[in-house]
């Protein structure tokens, strides 16, 4: 069995994108930051959230005869939060329209999960709690948009 020697010095057509061996390796914080800011990660958050919601709803429908089947709603709530985090972080900043959409998704999903009706009987995602988070979302959005401008 013979081996083929590796060709030295052959450049690629996109040599400007080649990784230089003389550059310092990325720190763990930089690697995690790059991963969390990638579009694939953000789309993955939305997909995982949808899978959690669908799975929880399948189990809730089949467990409707059980008395304490509410614990099966936990993955659905986590999935809705996961979807909203994905929506908010798709382009690095959160517009007021996106935040309003996320508030509606969270409130409606809790309404459907708790008693199957949209009757505004929320206990977790109430208007007061979601409105209290407006400042946090706005400051995170400003911070992310400033980071995007510097890059």
UniProtKB/Swiss-Prot annotation:
The keyword Membrane applies. InterPro entries: CRPA (IPR008436). Keywords: Membrane, Transmembrane, Transmembrane helix. Pfam families: CRPA. The chain crosses the membrane at residues 43-63, 70-90. It is found in: Membrane. Residues 1-20 are annotated as: Disordered. It comes from the Bacteria. GO terms for cellular component: outer membrane. It is a multi-pass membrane protein. This is Sulfur-rich protein, serovar E. The gene is srp.
């Amino acid at each position: 069995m013979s081996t083929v020697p590796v060709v030295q010095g052959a450049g690629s057509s996109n040599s400007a994108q080649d990784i230089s061996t003389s550059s310092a390796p990325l720190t763990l914080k930089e690697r995690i930051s790059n991963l969390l800011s990638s579009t694939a990660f953000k789309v993955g958050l939305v997909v995982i959230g949808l899978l959690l919601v669908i799975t929880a709803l399948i189990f809730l429908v089949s467990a409707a005869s059980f008395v304490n089947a509410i614990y099966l709603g936990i993955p659905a709530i986590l999935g809705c939060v996961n979807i909203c985090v994905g929506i908010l972080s798709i382009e690095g900043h959160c517009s007021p329209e996106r935040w309003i959409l996320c508030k509606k998704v969270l409130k409606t999903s809790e309404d459907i999960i708790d008693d199957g009706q949209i009757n505004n009987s929320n206990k977790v995602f109430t208007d007061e709690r979601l409105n209290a988070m407006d400042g946090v979302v706005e400051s995170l959005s400003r911070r992310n948009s400033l980071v995007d401008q510097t890059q």
